[in-house]
Amino acid sequence: MKEYFVYEIKNKEVYDDFIQYMLEHSDFFSVIYFRNRKDSPLNKYLKEYKKILRPYILHAENTRKWPNTETWNGRSVYRIAFYYADMKCYDVLTRVNDIFEWHYPRAPMDLCFYKNGYCWFALTAHEEMAYLYTNNEKEIQELRELGVMVEFSEDNARLFHYDLEKEMNHYRTKILNKKL
């Protein structure tokens, strides 16, 4: 798979077009809800995002690893939440002005998009690093035409895969076993 570095999304209009494109061409997306400690509540901004996105939730779990990020901080809580890529999510995903605003405390962290279980847009907002993973030159050209500035980074990039169906089946089994 080819990796492309996203080095600029010129303005809010381009950002909004990018979000629309990603929602239309992805199966699901993820964000990270951060808390300083297990006993810390989510802040008001994160609660609002979570409430608005609740109808589109697929799965959520605490994690230490997500696309292009791994944390060793054992005290903080990172909860990855996966949502259907539905155009009804457009308004909440375009509340921020730029991809690098997907960062605590004003928004959930690290918005990522997935296709066929693979992350094809990975964001590490606090490091201002964003990558697209695709072998489809047409997708890259369409994004460039929207004003997304990308450059080829490498061939044979390692991809983050999330088997959402497996996780959802595991979750269903866990709930059924609790009821027995």
Residue spans for each PLM region:
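Structured alpha/beta or helical-core interaction and ligand-binding surfaces enriched in interleaved
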Residues: M1-L180
